[in-house]
């Protein structure tokens, strides 16, 4: 116990030296007004790194349990504005207030089961109200287990009425280092059941705490030194190239969540493990606005009705460990839980508009194995987001893809040339076919004319053959007639010779006859006269006989 008290005083002194005395610190309640258990004062406030100390830091919230002081948690404070339906303790107007019911934006430990039940967390308390001590209370509340114990005043904090109970969780602080509060995880659901009004009355007495931190060095000096080393390493601009190469190696191994966390830390959007997401507004105000909006969304879901008292059971609850942070069973797709983009994470993404930028080309050459790609390949990669993301994890595959695209382009070009040549040949053949068809028509016309002439000649030849046959027949007829005439002429000449002979004989005989006749002429004359007379006589007789 002596060592623990010494350690607690040591931690409070360091806390005061880190943050100083602030005007918004919580006044301490006198011990006489609190029913404190000395067994629960062992855990002290965690150390905050000096680079994030600010005199204007916001303070914690009222205690969540009236009789117990569990170990304080540094992960429950989210800056938010006062809701219209919340209790208004300050008549002074719209002052900035803090709500205990709002979890951290992305992966705070309020989204995990808390160490102790806190049925009075759904309240927004103004910091100036606590400073001025305006709460005229009938009940004194001890310091909340989820507030920072950096106050130096001695006045007591009083509230006018008890806050409505809400759903509470239990969890262990020791398993997760403070640096993992930037991880966008969905908190695991604890086993829970509702209690009646009588059970809620006895719950605060019978519910034990789960786990208490006994060593102040685990959350104190160790976390502070670790976070100082992390920020000094990541904020060193000379190590950006080493970070890029290490992130590329981690992405090959599948640790993309850790890369996003480290790049967001390097950009200065996250603070050390003891600060909440709301307290980093001095580093990155835009990220703070996004975290406030997501915190308000989750607060509206986690609110319960004022009349319904819900308390967890005494059964065992799981605590999220480092190993479960990287399990793929948890949901990483909720857009409201994703952290705002930081320069560290955006440097790994390449858009087509960055293709002309020389700095992006240099970053690419460092990422892609120190200039493995040529300038033309770099332009193609930067023009395509998918290729750029793939080049981070597997540059050889991107190289193969680009080579395949080039070969495909060459083959396509050859194919197009071949198609053009074939089209030219087809056109040439078509023109030749047209000319040949024209010549063929002319030849067909000539052939038709020649066939007609041939037919005419055939007819004429046939006619001439007929004429020749007729001439031959005529010649034969003429030859026969000539022969017949010749024969006729030969017979006539013989007859003439015979006639000449006969005429000569007849002349001689006529001369002899004449001589003889001349000699016999008077005799003949007489005979003739006698014959005539005889004839006359006969004729006369005949005529007479006839008469």
Curated annotation (Swiss-Prot):
**Gene Ontology CC terms, in alphabetical order:** cytoplasm; cytosol; nucleus
Q: Which InterPro entries does the entry mention?
A: bZIP, bZIP_RF2, bZIP_sf
Is this entry keyworded Nucleus?
A: yes
Q: Where is the composition biased (Polar residues)?
A: 15-52, 74-89, 134-157, 264-275, 344-356, 536-547
Q: Which GO terms describe its biological process?
A: regulation of DNA-templated transcription; reproductive shoot system development
Coiled-coil annotated residue ranges, if any: 416-469
Q: Where in the cell is it found?
A: Cytoplasm; Nucleus
Q: Report where it is expressed, by tissue.
A: Expressed in roots, leaves and flowers. Expressed in the root tips, lateral root primordia, and guard cells of leaves, hypocotyls and anthers.
Chief site of localization: cytoplasm
Q: Where is the composition biased (Basic and acidic residues)?
A: 120-132, 249-263
PROSITE patterns xref list: BZIP
Which residues does the annotated region (Leucine-zipper) include? 422-457
Q: What happens when the gene is disrupted?
A: Increased size of rosette leaves, increased plant height and increased length of siliques.
Keyword Nucleus applies: yes
Alphabetically sorted, this entry's keywords are: Coiled coil, Cytoplasm, DNA-binding, Growth regulation, Nucleus, Stress response, Transcription, Transcription regulation
Provide the residue span(s) of the region labelled Disordered.
1-199, 244-312, 333-356, 517-547
The ranges of region (Basic motif) come to: 396-417
Stretches of Pro residues bias are at 63-73
User: Which residues belong to any copy of the bZIP domain?
Assistant: 394-457
Which Pfam families does the UniProt record give?
bZIP_1
The miscellaneous comment for this protein is: Plants lines expressing a bZIP29-SRDX dominant-negative repressor under a constitutive 35S promoter are seedling lethal.
Q: What does this protein do?
A: Transcription factor that acts as a repressor of reproductive development, meristem size and plant growth. Regulates meristem size, cell size and cell number during plant development. Binds to the promoters of the cell cycle regulators CYCB1-2 and SMR4, and genes involved in cell wall organization, such as XTH9, EXPA1 and EXPA3. Possesses transactivation activity in yeast. Possesses transactivation activity in plant protoplasts. Plays a role in abiotic stress response by binding to the 5'-CAGCTG-3' DNA sequence found in the promoters of MYB44 and TRX8.
Q: How does it assemble?
A: Forms homodimers.
Name this polypeptide is given: bZIP transcription factor 29
Query: Organism, per UniProt?
Result: Arabidopsis thaliana (Mouse-ear cress)
Gene symbol here is BZIP29
């Amino acid at each position: 116990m002596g060592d623990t008290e010494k350690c607690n005083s040591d931690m409070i002194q360091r806390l005061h030296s880190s943050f100083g005395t602030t005007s918004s610190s919580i006044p301490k309640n006198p011990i006489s007004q609190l029913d404190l258990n000395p067994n629960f004062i062992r855990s002290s406030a965690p150390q905050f790194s000096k680079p994030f100390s600010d005199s204007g830091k916001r303070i914690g919230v009222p205690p969540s349990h009236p009789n117990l002081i569990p170990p304080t948690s540094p992960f429950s404070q989210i800056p938010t504005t006062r809701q219209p339906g919340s209790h208004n303790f300050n008549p002074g107007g719209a002052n900035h207030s803090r709500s205990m019911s709002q979890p951290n934006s992305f992966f705070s430990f309020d989204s995990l089961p808390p160490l102790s039940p806190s049925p009075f967390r759904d309240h927004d308390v103004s910091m100036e109200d606590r400073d001025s001590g305006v709460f005229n209370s009938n009940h004194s509340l001890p310091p909340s287990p989820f507030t920072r114990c950096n106050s130096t005043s001695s006045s007591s904090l009083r509230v006018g009425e008890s806050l409505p109970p809400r759903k509470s969780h239990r969890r262990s602080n020791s398993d997760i280092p403070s640096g993992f509060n930037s991880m966008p995880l969905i908190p695991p659901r604890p086993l829970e059941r509702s209690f009646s009004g009588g059970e809620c009355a006895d719950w605060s007495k019978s519910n034990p705490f789960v786990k208490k931190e006994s060593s102040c060095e685990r959350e104190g000096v160790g976390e502070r030194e670790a976070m100082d080393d992390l920020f000094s390493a990541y904020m060193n601009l000379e190590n950006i190239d080493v970070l890029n190469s290490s992130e590329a190696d981690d992405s090959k191994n599948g640790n993309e969540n850790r890369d996003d966390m480290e790049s967001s830390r390097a950009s200065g959007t996250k603070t050390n493990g003891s600060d909440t997401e709301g307290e980093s507004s001095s580093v990155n105000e835009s990220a703070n606005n996004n975290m406030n909006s997501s915190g308000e969304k989750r607060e509206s879901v986690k609110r319960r009705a004022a009349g319904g008292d819900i308390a967890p059971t005494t059964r065992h609850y799981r605590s999220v460990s480092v190993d479960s942070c990287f399990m793929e069973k948890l949901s990483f797709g909720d857009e409201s839980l994703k952290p705002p983009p930081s320069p560290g994470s955006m440097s790994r993404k390449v858009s087509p508009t960055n293709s002309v930028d020389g700095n992006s080309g240099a970053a690419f050459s460092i990422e892609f194995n120190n200039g493995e790609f040529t300038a033309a390949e770099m332009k193609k990669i930067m023009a395509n987001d998918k290729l750029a993301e793939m080049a981070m994890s597997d540059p050889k595959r991107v190289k193969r893809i680009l080579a395949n695209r080039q070969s495909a382009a060459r083959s396509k070009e050859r194919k197009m040339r071949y198609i053009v040549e074939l089209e030219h040949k087809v056109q040439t053949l078509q023109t030749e076919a047209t000319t040949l068809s024209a010549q063929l028509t002319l030849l067909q016309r000539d052939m038709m004319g020649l066939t007609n002439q041939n037919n005419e000649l055939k007819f004429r030849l046939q006619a001439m053959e007929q004429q020749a046959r007729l001439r031959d027949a005529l010649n034969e007829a003429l030859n026969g007639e000539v022969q017949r005439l010749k024969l006729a002429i030969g017979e006539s000449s013989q007859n003439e010779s015979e006639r000449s002979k006969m005429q000569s004989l007849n002349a001689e005989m006529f001369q002899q006859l004449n001589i003889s006749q001349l000699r016999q002429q008077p005799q003949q004359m007489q005979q003739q006269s006698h014959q005539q007379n005889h004839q006359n006589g006969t004729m006369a007789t005949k005529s007479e006989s006839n008469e």
